[in-house]
């Protein structure tokens, strides 16, 4: 009996170690568990995707309810010669909480870009991609569901996923310094109906250095604002002609521990709330802080705690106001590298006020629960 018991214990320990290794690999990879569709004669194509089945519980009617979606994408590359490689990536999101009669309403292209990699001399790509400021913002955007929302925003200049960006990236500083990476980016003008999602011509820079689990980085971006953005100036809307962001971050990722913090300031850039037409306001200035701590247990559990705050400055007659402030407590349990479940509790620290009511800034808590299958 003892021999059988010891054998069972060894098997359990082995499985726990396999789960831990799988989860660590999953978290470290940009696109995880991709299915290799084709790999021959220097041409490679990987398919990846996930189904994110989740529900929000909140007193905020705009947040409460089903939030299920699915994503599908591919990454491909072709070896042109021993020094030059072509690559491309596309990713799309399908909403799972819409009725069939609504069709593809709110489905969206998340990524779509192509480029060339020149051996140790770096890579260049163009299309819909992440802005270089997100190189720092990504360090704290790791919570089970929420997080990364004080200043990194989609289609808001170069702080998140955005369109029309030409990006140069260099890894390990021309192959000379391991862990030292930098990027330069240019974004062309995008004048859309919604002023808060428009941008003028701009550029961005980022640099990060990682060594034995420790990381430090900084990013800067500056853009012209469109005429419509400047004309939309109001009590709560920024009037400046340029949008600007700088950000710095620190992180530690080793020994099953993940710690990260970022600080940033933005000018005429960060969106918040909602006006009468359903468009977001744009803050004159914000000061933003994010910090997160996580631990990966060998049996698959990854608890997480974070604090996030964004302070809006010079908001017309309202002066300085908190735009975002909450504590996030959550956990993810990985059954294996393909299946996980999570719970995430966003404890909103904002109080109801004349400002939150006028700007329609939510002050309610949210609990998110869900299952995630990915390949």
UniProtKB/Swiss-Prot annotation:
PROSITE patterns: GRAM_NEG_PORIN. Induction: Expressed in high osmolarity conditions (at protein level). The lineage of its organism: Bacteria, Pseudomonadati, Pseudomonadota, Gammaproteobacteria, Enterobacterales. It comes from the Bacteria. This is Outer membrane porin OmpD. The gene is ompD. Residues 1-34 form the signal peptide. Homotrimer. Mixed heterotrimers with other porins are also probable. Pfam families: Porin_1.
């Amino acid at each position: 009996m003892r021999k059988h018991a010891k054998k069972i214990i060894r098997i359990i320990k082995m499985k726990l170690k396999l789960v831990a290794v799988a989860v660590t690999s999953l978290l470290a990879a940009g696109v995880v568990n991709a299915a290799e569709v084709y790999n021959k004669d220097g041409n490679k194509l990987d398919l990846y995707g996930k189904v994110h089945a989740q529900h929000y519980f909140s007193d905020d009617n705009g947040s409460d309810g089903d939030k299920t979606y699915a994503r599908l994408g591919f990454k491909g590359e072709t070896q042109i010669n021993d020094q030059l490689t072509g690559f491309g990536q596309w990713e799309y999101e399908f909403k799972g909480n819409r009725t069939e009669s609504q069709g593809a309403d709110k489905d969206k292209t998340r990524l779509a870009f192509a480029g060339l990699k020149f051996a140790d001399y770096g890579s260049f790509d163009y299309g819909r991609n992440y802005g270089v400021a997100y190189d720092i913002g990504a360090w704290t955007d790791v919570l089970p569901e929420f997080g990364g929302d004080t200043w990194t925003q989609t289609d808001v200049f170069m702080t998140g996923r955005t369109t029309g960006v030409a990006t140069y990236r260099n890894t390990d500083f021309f192959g000379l310094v391991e862990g030292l990476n930098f990027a330069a980016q240019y974004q062309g003008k995008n004048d859309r109906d919604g002023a808060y999602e428009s941008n003028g011509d701009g550029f961005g820079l980022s640099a990060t250095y990682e060594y034995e689990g420790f990381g430090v980085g900084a990013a800067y971006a500056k853009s012209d604002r469109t005429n419509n953005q400047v004309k939309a100036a109001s009590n709560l809307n920024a009037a400046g002609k340029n949008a600007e962001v700088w950000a710095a971050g620190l992180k530690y990722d080793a020994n099953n521990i993940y710690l990260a913090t970022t600080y940033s300031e933005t000018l005429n850039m960060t969106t918040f709330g909602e006006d009468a037409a359903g468009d977001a306001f744009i803050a004159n200035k914000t000061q933003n802080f994010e910090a997160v701590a996580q631990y990966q247990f060998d049996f698959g559990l990854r608890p997480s705690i974070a604090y996030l705050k964004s302070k809006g400055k010079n908001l017309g007659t309202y002066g300085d106001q908190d735009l975002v402030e909450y504590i996030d407590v959550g956990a993810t349990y990985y059954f294996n590298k393909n299946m996980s479940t999570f719970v995430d509790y966003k404890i909103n620290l904002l109080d109801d006020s004349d400002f939150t009511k006028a700007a329609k800034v939510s002050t309610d808590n949210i609990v998110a629960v869900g299952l995630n299958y990915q390949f």
